Amino acid sequence: MRARSLSHTLLPAVFLATAGVWGCSPPAADPPEETAATSAAPPAERGGQETYGPYDLVDNWPKPLPDGPDGVAHAGWTWGSMGSVYAETPDRIWIAMRGELPLPEGAEPWTPYSMLRPPRRSTGNDDGRSATCEPVAPRGWERRYHHVIFVVDGDGNVVQHWAQHDALFDMTCGRGPHKIKMSPYDPDKHVWIIDDQLHVIYKFTYDGELVLTLGTKGQRGRDAGRLFDRPTDIAWLPDGTFFISDGYGGTRVAKFDKDGNFLMDWGQPPVDPKNPGPNEFNTVHSIAIGADRRLFVVDRAHGRFQIFDENGQFLDMFYTGPRGEGDDPGAPGIVSRPYSHLITVDQYLWVSDGGTDRILKYDLDGNYLYGWGGPGGWPGQFQGPHAMTVDQDGNLYTAEVFAGRVQKFRPTPGADPDKLVGQELRWSGSD
């Protein structure tokens, strides 16, 4: 099928957070009566805007990390790059953090790197190493692997910390976890964690016992289920069959049975990077499955989705934004960079776009429906929204790799339900 470009529907990625920070503009002419109030605002309110889309930002969430019984203190340290977040319930939110980062002298406690002056990027590999473990100029600060996997309650307080597994991610050329998830079809609620830099996929029991490792730690390649090349995400069918997006280097989707036995894979690098075809990938970054069993796969550096059946047959593709001036020599001309996506119970596709730093809604035919957000380091803005998740109360959580934070957004009273990210499919105990 032909690719459908949606470039004419993508809104500009310009976002003004607060007038007190960015300054004021001259007042605009009154809008037409039917558009004067947003759907998320009281009808009598004058002025204003959907600053955070149909949500209110929850301030000071999560709470600062506690000093641990292991003697690790947090004075002078702050949040690291946030690889992923998963809302099991409104009172159990799992966070995968790529280690804690040191604060420069004089910085306020728990200042995210995006809000330092000058700001810093929280992501990165071992100091002085590239993503492929080659020597590069050191940036001058380094993480420590503490609070890598932890759980917070609805108020943002830490209620669980897998301290016993912090060291699992501490290896030369590593950078910490890329994704944390639970299968919606698993009554035992196993926790899956993907470490892209170390090329492994871990499966844990709910209380933290490691029961399965796919891949060979620290070794990259493409060899069935024995070697991966920076895997990124996982998705399941109801019978437990699962698919791995592999990944930054692997240019493939790999299929496994419920016991972790390799079944097949598909995908290859583009023959012509300027004109990639079906089944050709540059950074297979996220994967989700619709109720009709179609696989929606993020081809990130090509700025698009590719859609397959469960046996790897290509079905369709569409782009998530304009093809303008890009900064990736492997995919010139792409502006949009879809980072992660959900297919909600009501069968819509929600995307966090790291190129435009927006949250986007599509139908499953690829038609653009709505979007909000924009780039910046201040609260409510985004710098690399790498993962998103929704709890049963409709709260939206985002994890940012460049800003070094997880943010919580609560639905605004009276918000248009069509603008709210819908429910994720999850194990309910009644299926």
Model-predicted segments: where are they?
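Bacterial signal peptide processing site
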Residues: 25-27
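Eukaryotic scaffold repeat domains enriched in small/polar residues
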Residues: 31-431
